Amino acid sequence: MPKHSKRYNEVRKLVDRNKDYDLNEAIDLAKKVATAKFDETVELHIKTNIDYRKSDQQIRSTIALPHGTGKEVKVLVFATGEKAEEAKAAGADYVGAEDLAEKIQKENFLDFDVAIATPDMMRVIGKLGKILGPRGLMPNPKAGTVTNDVASAVKEFKKGRMEVRTDKTGNLHIPVGKASFDNEKLKENIKSAYEQILNLKPAGVKGNFIKKVVLSTTMGPGIKVDPATLTQ
């Protein structure tokens, strides 16, 4: 069992682990237990009923939050010529082709949060799969990160659009803001994220799609949320 800090053990006492909190209560409580010396990220964890062993039940898509996540997103773009210029104009942090691929390979350069590529660049970045894949950074059409419209993609991801994908136990982990956000912004982000996930339900899922919803902060305990209050 992991050993928790004294601070964590103190704030954990504030949370009733057997209760499903109303969303408003959960947000209040999440902010109350966010006592670290930095602005903690508020995270929405959704346990789904998907069968991860079936490829048609895996979720991989993107969602956008009305108020963003509060994090500055670094975007890298693999493109050349006119598309490279469009990416730079849109605010991409790094733009290149073979040179960037080589930097990632040889220097383990990973100082970015999102990688976007034009379709013709897949031949260049194919060899980066072992490096970028496990970190969730490999460009993918399903995630909207393989596209010819690089300018729009850069702007969207800069504004807070993010990739969401189920892990190996069928769970989703979604940053929905910072503890410093006011309650209404957090509420709108959480409800928006949840509704977008509901719309991504794979056709093959049997029974209830959502099994459990938990809200937490970076250093705080999990707070169970009544799913019904997320769609009211």
Swiss-Prot record:
GO cellular component: large ribosomal subunit
Assembly behavior: Part of the 50S ribosomal subunit.
Protein's organism: Thermosipho africanus (strain TCF52B)
Function: Binds directly to 23S rRNA. The L1 stalk is quite mobile in the ribosome, and is involved in E site tRNA release. Protein L1 is also a translational repressor protein, it controls the translation of the L11 operon by binding to its mRNA.
Protein name per UniProt: Large ribosomal subunit protein uL1
Entries under Pfam families matching the protein: Ribosomal_L1
Molecular function terms, GO-annotated: rRNA binding; structural constituent of ribosome; tRNA binding
Name of the gene: rplA
Record keywords: Repressor, Ribonucleoprotein, Ribosomal protein, RNA-binding, rRNA-binding, Translation regulation, tRNA-binding
Keyword Phosphoprotein tagged: no
Biological process annotations from GO: regulation of translation; translation
Gene3D superfamilies named in the record: 3.30.190.20, 3.40.50.790
InterPro entries in the cross-refs: Ribosom_uL1_bac-type, Ribosomal_uL1, Ribosomal_uL1-like, Ribosomal_uL1/biogenesis, Ribosomal_uL1_3-a/b-sand, Ribosomal_uL1_CS
Family statement drawn from the similarity comment of this UniProt entry: Belongs to the universal ribosomal protein uL1 family.
Record-linked HAMAP family: Ribosomal_uL1_B (MF_01318_B)
PROSITE patterns with a match to the protein in the record: RIBOSOMAL_L1
